[in-house]
Regions:
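"…together with the soluble PPM/PP2C metallo-phosphatase catalytic core" -> "…together
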Residues: 1-177
Length: 177
């Protein structure tokens, strides 16, 4: 949070210098012009804190989390490019497929649902569809002031609590956000 907060003056200056704003019009619900770079401080803070946490607690986990961090970085960079220069839908989908592939083919996939173990191909397909679906669901509501941030906060808080109750270290990464 502190890194995000400290980065805001620089982000506002960059938005002003390069005129990177979402301008108010009759279809927008925000009042005034809003920087399109708001997520930059949050994303950079998240990546720095996550990598620092992993390296300071158990550096052997770095390569376990690297595909997920890399996928997040790819989605972030192309999301930023899309905010500044609108990308075609096919380009966004290809980027999502590449990022999702990083995650899945590094062994991160749904292996079971409840007590039921998933067949390998179903596991890959379900994980792929879920990741792409979540990316697009959040992208869809991103233009609605406060909704995406509120839903993200609620989701991460819930996951953090679930991981804490199950003694999973991923809880710390959830709470870093």
């Amino acid at each position: 949070f502190v890194l995000s907060l400290l980065s805001m003056p620089l982000i506002i200056k960059l938005s002003t210098k390069f005129n990177i704003f979402d301008y108010q019009d009759s279809r927008k619900i925000h009042s005034g012009n809003v920087s399109r770079l708001g997520g930059v401080g949050i994303a950079i803070s998240f990546f720095i804190c996550t990598v620092a946490y992993i390296l300071l607690t158990d550096s052997s986990l770095f390569f376990t989390y690297l595909p997920i961090i890399s996928a997040g970085l790819i989605i972030f960079v192309f999301g930023l490019i899309d905010d500044i220069h609108t990308l075609r839908a096919i380009i966004k989908l290809l980027v999502q497929i590449i990022a999702t592939s990083f995650v899945i083919f590094s062994g991160n996939r749904f292996k079971q649902i409840g007590p039921f173990e998933l067949p390998l191909i179903i596991s890959y397909i379900l994980t792929f569809c879920w990741i792409i679906g979540v990316i697009n669901a959040f992208n869809l509501i991103d233009g609605l002031d406060g909704l995406c941030g509120s839903l993200s906060f609620t989701t991460i808080l819930t996951l953090g609590i679930i991981y804490t109750l199950s003694s999973n270290n991923v809880a710390v990464i959830c709470f870093i956000l």
